[in-house]
Amino acid sequence: VDFLSDKESGTIVLWENFDLIEKSSGNVYAELGKHQNATAEYLSLIFHRYLNGEGRNPLTIMVNNYKLTGLDPFLENHRKTNVRRKIEIPIKDSEGKERIVSVQPFVLPFQKDLSAEDKRLSGGIENYRAKQGFYIYRNKRLIIWGTWFGRHRDELTKYARIKVDIPNSLDDIWGIDIKKQHATIPAIIRNRLTK
């Protein structure tokens, strides 16, 4: 708690009493290390746009005094990333008010053109091709990634990642659950995205 004493604002998540981990593995610190790394990677992906300061001051997230840096699943600054034109799709919310869903495709570089840092930023080489597809953001927070929503993957899409930004006013249209971990793409959007 002292960590926040000199800060203007902040939140601390404190984990204590790891009796289940201790009983299951016997080595609490080794298991916590695995969970810590997985948690840091997850947060670095989910909140990457906030951590990188997109459109605002960068957010700071620390895991055991380690400051997280945002990943970049689109490798937007890589010289060989093909950044395609952003399109905006108007859609009416449940009250009939027009909202905008923005869509921007990226074609990522071939693996041979990636540095070790590029591989880390894109989410790891083991996920490089497996996690191609749509990346759905709700208010710049990543909620779904690496899915084609049932669309067949082919040679033309093997390096494609598509950023889709939706406002929170479309939660009900997208079927976003309370945990912000599930969404169902509306037919009007699916038809436009899969063209």
Describe the predicted segments one by one.
Residues 22-24, 31, 35, 80-195:
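Charged regulatory segments coupled to nucleotide-binding catalytic modules in large multidomain enzymes
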Residues 44, 48-95:
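Accessory nucleic acid-recognition modules appended to NTPase machines
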Residues 1-4, 8-10, 15-19, 70-77, ...:
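Bulky hydrophobic/aromatic packing residues
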Residues 1-63:
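GHKL-type ATPase core
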Residues 5, 14-17, 27, 72, ...:
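Serine/threonine-rich low-complexity intrinsically disordered regions
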